[in-house]
Amino acid sequence: MAQQVQSEIRYLTPPSVDVKKKKYCRFKKSGIKYIDYKDPEFLKKFLNEQGKILPRRITGTSLKFQRRIAQAVKRARHLALLPFVTDMMK
């Protein structure tokens, strides 16, 4: 009976950890210096479905360009190019 109990013991295998690709700042890579607030289609890439600005850890942008994105989105909202709040933006 002791052998039967030992054979039923199952060891947990460690979860497979997928190596994620390193996030990079697309602005530094492509050499973009100015983020145009008059281009709402480009700015929508950095917004979620509710119209909120996506954080850096998701988009992978650097701090410098994240601030510029936030400023451009806020300017576009004031000019009514982007909505402040929405249900299904994308």
Swiss-Prot record:
Annotated disulfide bonds: none
Entry GO terms, CC: cytosolic small ribosomal subunit
SUPFAM superfamilies: Ribosomal protein S18 (SSF46911)
Gene3D superfamilies (UniProt xref): Ribosomal protein S18
Pfam families: Ribosomal_S18
Keywords: Ribonucleoprotein, Ribosomal protein, RNA-binding, rRNA-binding
Gene Ontology biological process terms from the UniProt entry: translation
GO MF terms held by the record: small ribosomal subunit rRNA binding; structural constituent of ribosome
Domain of life according to the entry: Bacteria
Keyword Ribonucleoprotein attributed: yes
Complexes and interactors: Part of the 30S ribosomal subunit. Forms a tight heterodimer with protein bS6.
NCBIfam families reported for this sequence: S18 (TIGR00165)
Function: Binds as a heterodimer with protein bS6 to the central domain of the 16S rRNA, where it helps stabilize the platform of the 30S subunit.
Family statement drawn from the similarity comment of this UniProt entry: Belongs to the bacterial ribosomal protein bS18 family.
Listed name of the protein: Small ribosomal subunit protein bS18
Species whose genome carries this gene: Bacteroides fragilis (strain ATCC 25285 / DSM 2151 / CCUG 4856 / JCM 11019 / LMG 10263 / NCTC 9343 / Onslow / VPI 2553 / EN-2)
Record gene name: rpsR
